[in-house]
Amino acid sequence: MNLPNGHVLQNGKYRITHVIGQGGFGITYKGVWYTEVKGSLGTVQTEVPICIKEYFFKDYCYRETESFAVKVHSETGKVLFDKFKEKLIKEAKILSEVHHPHIVNVLEVFEENDTAYIAMEYISGCSLKYMMDREGILPEPKVLRYVRQIGEALQFVHEKNILHLDIKPSNILIDSSGKARLIDFGVSKRYDIEQQETSTTMLTLSKGFASIEQYDNEGTQSFSPCPDIYSLGATMYNLLTGKIPTESILRATRPLQKPSELNKDISP
């Protein structure tokens, strides 16, 4: 289903090295970008490690063996595929203009093989989810530092009327310098100056991290930073306790246990 190692895109500009991950809406590859760097010694050709996301709607698509083109099983599926491909391209182009030290940079969005690709900065590091799986509950000072950094990233995108809508530990990378970087704007929404939604989005709910507004189709039609703030708080709870919070839609009948009851080492 994925592109083979060594496959080239954009007439040789990018080369796939291997698959990093795969989800319901796409495949993520590590690759290299062949580019030129100008300096005191002249122009030097170099290879820059990058990350490439391929839009691949797993439940609706298949790949042709010889051409590597992505095809859709049915006409109904093609309507959905095309709709969300256009949304992905639109949002990726917006994000290519958004540069912040705690957000992974988008280099380019392009179409090939009858689908869409996003070339992004490659971050050497691991996600907070992987870090937790490996180390267990994280120390409070470290959690506060990461949450503060992602909060700065969210403030930046919120000022541009963009909601991320999928904040969770697996979408926060910690790079080799220890800096938190927000990734995966695949279900994000952008709003106009009147704070009305200008793009549709794929319905994706990360249970325990999604705000109650995200369970209602009309809950995110108008801009509000609340869904992202809630999800960042839920992420903080998870990092400090090791527990995924009660789903927001169930909180009225299933109270959330206090973090200090689950982790005696954190501030009350």
Can you annotate each of these PLM segments?
Residues T17-G23, T28:
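Protein kinase glycine-rich loop
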Residues G208-P268:
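C-terminal lobe helix-coil module of Hanks-type protein kinase domains
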